Amino acid sequence: MIASKFGIGQQVRHSLLGYLGVVVDIDPEYSLDEPSPDELAVNDELRAAPWYHVVMEDDDGQPVHTYLAEAQLRSEMRDEHPEQPSMDELARTIRKQLQAPRLRN
């Protein structure tokens, strides 16, 4: 069993770039199409660790879906981000849905 460091709905930061994001899904290992060595120069150990679907904002405030390795992320300690309220709202909405999902008939 592979344990993930971050959970769905959790706010995280990109380790190198510092961008704020929200985890929307988790893969236990790299699961996109097999990359060519030019596209993704990672070792097997990194590919075997959890990978995260993370929504971040671009410079214009538009949502961007990213796919990042666990090693590329760090925890975000603050819950409120006045400079990016949409990321706070997305995180709250996801956590609320996980706690009280709406059932469809």
From Swiss-Prot:
GO terms for cellular component: cytoplasm. The keyword Cytoplasm applies. One of its GO terms (biological process) is response to heat. Keywords: Cytoplasm, Stress response. It holds the Pfam family YccV-like. It is found in: Cytoplasm. SUPFAM superfamilies: YccV-like. Residues 76-105 are annotated as: Disordered. Involved in the degradation of certain denaturated proteins, including DnaA, during heat shock stress. Belongs to the HspQ family. This is Heat shock protein HspQ. The gene is hspQ.
